[in-house]
């Protein structure tokens, strides 16, 4: 939560209200209890249990191998650490594409079994019926348009989306369709900033940008990226607020040295 919203439970109505008041929304990914607790404590409004965990936690090359069991496991951990923040869980690849019924059933598991408050799924008009059925069933939904990582093979890599007139128009239409289907928010990833601004102005629901400029109603980053923990690849849109990899290396090197030379444990860290 921000200073204004810190200490109160974040709900879909709070998130919608923040757009109306012009208050920016903060979202970061979280994959475990410890990180979720820290982010919740300092005031992040929304914690996204992203399928990005496949890359930054499990070491895969993409999000595609991530399973429902993976996502449920990590969502449970994050939910236990979130006292006030809203927990949003990604529906992984092939958990919602085959049928509306399967999509709703899998989405419901995140709320029922893992303590999530909402789910996020990628796509536009092709998932509109699933979004509608989820919301009718009482499952809050966050949409995801632009660069949708689960479709990276179709896009031919991680590329900016919506650069041409036709592509931009389709994303704008999809955003409206997802809103009308019942989503309470939508993530816009890797789209030109002017397009994201137009979509933000056109929608009643909040937009959360990642590589979509400052005009969105909120921003999201992968926490491992912004803290400098994940070093395999850093997207252009990531600002590193820390470089914890160096801190971790330094601490572990000192530990190794002290164990090797016998200075750890000393009397202060021993039972006498």
Swiss-Prot record:
Coiled-coil region list: none
EC number, UniProt record: 2.1.2.11
Keyword annotations of the record: Cytoplasm, Magnesium, Metal-binding, Pantothenate biosynthesis, Transferase
Location in the cell: Cytoplasm
GO molecular function terms listed in the Swiss-Prot or TrEMBL record: 3-methyl-2-oxobutanoate hydroxymethyltransferase activity; magnesium ion binding
Cofactor binding comment, as recorded: Binds 1 Mg(2+) ion per subunit.
Binding site for Mg(2+): 51, 90, 122
Swiss-Prot/TrEMBL catalytic activity: 3-methyl-2-oxobutanoate + (6R)-5,10-methylene-5,6,7,8-tetrahydrofolate + H2O = 2-dehydropantoate + (6S)-5,6,7,8-tetrahydrofolate
Gene Ontology CC annotation, any one: cytoplasm
Cleaved signal peptide residues: none
UniProt cofactor(s): Mg(2+)
Keyword Transferase attributed: yes
Subunit and interaction comment: Homodecamer; pentamer of dimers.
Membership in a protein family: Belongs to the PanB family.
Name listed for the protein in its UniProt record: 3-methyl-2-oxobutanoate hydroxymethyltransferase
Source organism (scientific name): Syntrophus aciditrophicus (strain SB)
Lineage: Bacteria, Pseudomonadati, Thermodesulfobacteriota, Syntrophia, Syntrophales
Gene that this polypeptide is encoded by: panB
């Amino acid at each position: 939560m921000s200073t204004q919203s810190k200490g109160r439970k974040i709900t879909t109505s709070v998130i919608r209200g923040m757009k109306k008041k012009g208050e920016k929304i903060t979202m970061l990914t979280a994959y475990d209890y410890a990180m979720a607790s820290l982010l919740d404590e300092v005031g992040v409004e929304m914690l996204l249990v992203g399928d990005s965990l496949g890359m930054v936690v499990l070491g895969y090359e993409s999000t595609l191998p991530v399973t429902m069991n993976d996502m449920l496991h990590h969502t449970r951990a994050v939910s236990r650490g979130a006292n006030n923040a809203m927990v949003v869980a990604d529906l992984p690849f092939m958990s919602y594409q085959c049928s509306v019924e399967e999509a709703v059933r899998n989405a419901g598991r995140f709320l029922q079994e893992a303590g999530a408050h909402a789910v996020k799924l990628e796509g536009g008009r092709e998932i509109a019926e699933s979004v509608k059925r989820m919301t009718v069933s009482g499952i809050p939904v966050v949409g995801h348009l632009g660069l949708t990582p689960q479709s990276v093979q179709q896009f031919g890599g991680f590329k900016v989306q919506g650069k041409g007139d036709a592509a931009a128009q389709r994303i704008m239409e999809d955003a409206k369709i997802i809103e009308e289907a019942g989503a309470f928010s939508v993530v816009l990833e890797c789209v030109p900033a002017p397009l994201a601004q137009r979509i933000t102005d056109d929608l009643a629901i909040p937009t959360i940008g990642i590589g979509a400029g400052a005009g969105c109603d909120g921003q999201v980053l992968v926490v491992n990226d912004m803290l400098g923990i994940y070093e395999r690849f850093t997207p252009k849109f990531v600002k590193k607020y820390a470089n914890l990899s160096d801190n971790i290396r330094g601490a572990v090197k000192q530990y190794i040295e002290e164990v090797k030379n016998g200075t750890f444990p000393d009397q202060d860290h021993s039972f006498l």
